[in-house]
């Protein structure tokens, strides 16, 4: 009775050695964490929805709240104004939101003061597309929405580009002098 049982144990032991790789390497360190994308929290977008009516010269109604799991990343923002079916008429860089101790940033992101000046395209009657693009890296100069990658150090000391991410939100703004007076 012990003979067949012993044979089965020996056979299973021999076969099991084939299933486990014999050349395993154990990492002494965990590889660096990759970059996570930021996002615009949609229920915190102001004004809510996509269609917005705006009388020229009215106060800035636009703001967003951003979440980024990588709390050490500052958040860049760039604002675009488009005429119907056209390339951007203008874009402005907003103030960078600094790193935080929380994933959800407390400070709302609002358009920079330049867009409110009297010659702003949003102060002209008509329909415009107004877009905010956020990034967890730096926008490349004069490149629209292209963002510079993060540099990460690998376990062997080498460097790798860890991509930066963007998110965006678009409002369709109908601007008209015939709208009611501004509301605060």
Task: Tell me the role of every PLM-derived stretch.
Residues 63-71, 83:
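Extracellular acidic, Ser/Thr/Pro-rich low-complexity tracts
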Residues 53-66:
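A short beta-strand segment in extracellular, disulfide-stabilized domains
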